[in-house]
A protein has these predicted regions:
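PLP-dependent class I/II
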Residues: 1-239
Length: 239
């Protein structure tokens, strides 16, 4: 993934003999999003190359400004899509997700999963069922989820606008709760250490690959007053 391509994977650069292609949009760590046309290009490439397509859709409901993340299953059935209760329902510690897709792919996944652990505890599964039952007949997200997304959206605007005022070139993400930007330092680690000195934790982009060197990831998982405090510390501590 590269900045000049808006952090979208270029399938034309992927090896033709790939057995599996795994993509994640809305994307961690970049916050990048894609449309149906992009997904169709990826889907068609996988069909042409007999490549299994796996789509990590954990952030599909963490979207803003009218953007709706498309599902790969809107394009075709020969794929598998993974979802998570961690982000949408703030159930991070429960470690529960789900998969939907072509029956043959699901069958293969079940064989692998059955050898990894003994499954999620029943009480967690029941909590997830209750969460899904909160959705309306038309698929509308429950009020609790909409409220959470509004809060994340507001925090996102505060952090992005604050970083811009400090001189950073930051895109307003339409998905996830991550803010991704060029630190203007030679290395991500250099900026990360400077931020630690200010009492602020960020994630260095170098941990995500060579093309992410120099970038850092921040999150909007803290309330707005804390975000503003972090911005003030940056204003006073960075030059």
């Amino acid at each position: 993934l590269r900045a000049e391509k808006d952090w979208l994977l270029d399938v034309d650069e992927c090896p033709k003999g790939a057995k599996m292609l795994y993509i994640n949009y809305p994307n961690n760590p970049t916050g990048a999003t894609c449309d149906k046309d992009y997904l169709k290009k990826v889907y068609d490439w996988c069909q042409e190359n007999d490549t299994i397509l796996c789509v990590d859709d954990a952030y599909c409901e963490m979207t803003y400004d009218g953007y709706q993340a498309p599902s790969i299953l809107e394009i075709g059935e020969d794929a598998i899509e993974f979802g998570s209760f961690s982000k949408t329902f703030n159930m991070t510690g429960f470690r529960l997700g789900y998969a939907v897709g072509h029956p043959d792919l699901i069958a293969g996944l079940k064989k692998c999963k059955g050898q990894v652990d003994s499954g999620a505890p029943i009480f967690i599964q029941k909590a997830a069922i209750k969460a899904l039952e909160m959705y309306g007949e038309n698929g509308e997200a429950p009020e609790a989820v909409r409220k959470n997304m509004k809060e994340y959206s507001d925090r996102r605007e505060v952090l992005v606008n604050g970083l811009r005022e400090l001189g950073f070139d930051v895109k307003m993400p339409k998905g996830t709760f991550y803010i991704w930007f060029d630190s203007k330092c030679k290395t991500s680690l250099e900026f990360t250490e400077r931020m630690l000195d200010l009492g602020i934790v960020v994630t260095p982009g170098s941990g995500f690959g060579e093309s992410a060197e120099g970038y850092v990831r921040m999150t909007v998982t803290q309330p707005i007053p804390r975000i503003k405090e972090a911005l003030q510390r940056m204003k006073e501590g960075l030059n």
